[in-house]
């Protein structure tokens, strides 16, 4: 939803809610971990109240542990934290699960997938950033394909069940290859909301 029209957020949320999209992906930015500032809890609570979709909340913030219970209270279904922001990742993952949410971990483009090897079996989702986090509308980083393949091999090796999510620069040109490499979830922001017919664009992605 970062690429939505914030002046018409209800309209854009309703469009997604009535589309073939499976989830609503919400980027929470604090201006510290990433340069930008985005949605706060009151906005997310309002979105959840008026949406039937799974709420996939991506925390691009420092000290995410401080807010885990609050994000449960406002309706988050999936809560993803950055490995780069967590001093005690294993503890953070289990704190999320203790609140009955799905637990995800995000990796910045420069972060190796091997950095989360020891927690893979605890995860419901791994989000690979395919752009540098903090701003929408960036170009896709080509090395992401290799990281998806590496992560899929690790998933098979460890008999883990997490979903592989790709966030950033996703479009109809790179989506087929991402899926063939092993991606399960594609986050499309600018490609959807900047298109002439966002609902059809979502349908086109879902048809792949």
Name each region found by the language model.
Residues 1-80, 85-88, 95-98, 102-103, ...:
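Conserved N-terminal beta1-alpha1 strand-loop-helix module at the mouth
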Residues 76-84, 179-188:
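Short, electropositive alpha-helical surface patch
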Residues 7, 106-110, 168:
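Short gly/ser/thr-rich secondary-structure transition/capping motifs
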Residues 166-169, 187-191:
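Glycine-rich beta-strand-to-loop/alpha-helix junction loops that act as flexible
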Residues 25, 165-166:
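Generic enzyme active-site microenvironment
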Residues 169-181:
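Acidic, divalent-metal-coordinating active-site segment for phosphoryl/phosphodiester hydrolysis
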Residues 84-86, 108-110, 131-135, 190-193:
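Short, acidic/turn-prone active-site loops that include or flank metal/cofactor-
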